[in-house]
Amino acid sequence: MQLEELINQHYSKLNDNDFHILKYILNHKHTCYHLGIDALAKACSVSRSSILRLAQKLGFSGYSEFRVFLKWEDQPEEGESMSFEKLLDDIEANLKFLRTKDMTDMCQLIDAADRIFVYGSGNAQKICARDLQRMFIPRHRYLILIEDTNEFNLMRDDFKVNDLFIIISLSGETPELIPQARMLSAKGIPFISITNLKNNVLAQLTPHNLYATSKPVTLSDRTEIVAFAPFFLVGEALFRAYVDYKEAEKNDNE
């Protein structure tokens, strides 16, 4: 688990002082773990106890354990990776995440939902959404694809608490998407977020998060490319987890 995921997981516990400290840590990831608790407190202009409380809110026993986590997370690669190698790094990071991710709660939501809506916030995300829709057909779960904001707004009064949304967003910060996600949350309609692995608003609005690690690569002409293969991989993993969930349920009933 990376720091951004921990922030999303414990977001409701954090206050402005915590975010001030985290801003410093995120901006000095490669050096802050060299600092003892007093030095970090001084760098952030906060008290020693503020650092300790933040570490405990994030699930660590104390600052020493948090510091080891930060050191472990900072694993620089040897040399400059090329685009293809970075794609492989992204895929390996996603496989590592998926091997340890328990999706039972999401499978239960999929199984119990009267209707399942899938919503991608951009063109590439919509392709991922259509692929997810296609995968679930053999399992007789027919996902309803929402094409855009206008469609969502036309349908919003018909959404029920027994529905389920799967929302795919690269950033998790798309301006037109956040009010819609907040509306779902306010109405008690569950949704699964699939976003890039970083601190983002969409992931903070639901406990049901999946992350696709996809780091941008800047080419020599300053063109930036982002891989969407990790999003397809995460979608496939969700489907396979659901298949296994239903098979296990069938075996238990025999």
Swiss-Prot record:
Molecular function GO labels: carbohydrate derivative binding; DNA binding; DNA-binding transcription factor activity
Gene3D superfamilies listed in its UniProt record: Glucose-6-phosphate isomerase like protein, domain 1, Winged helix-like DNA-binding domain superfamily/Winged helix DNA-binding domain
Superkingdom field: Bacteria
Pfam families per record: HTH_6 (PF01418), SIS (PF01380)
Keyword annotations of the record: Activator, DNA-binding, Transcription, Transcription regulation
Domain SIS residue range list: 106-248
Coiled-coil positions: none
Biological processes annotated in GO: carbohydrate derivative metabolic process; regulation of DNA-templated transcription
Domain HTH rpiR-type: from-to ranges: 1-77
Induction: By maltose; repressed by glucose.
InterPro entries tied to this protein: Homeodomain-like_sf, HTH_RpiR, RpiR-like, RpiR-like_SIS, SIS_dom, SIS_dom_sf, WH-like_DNA-bd_sf
Known DNA-binding region: 37-56
Function noted in UniProt: Positive regulator of the glv operon expression, which consists of GlvA, GlvR and GlvC.
Protein name: HTH-type transcriptional regulator GlvR
Phylogenetic lineage: Bacteria, Bacillati, Bacillota, Bacilli, Bacillales
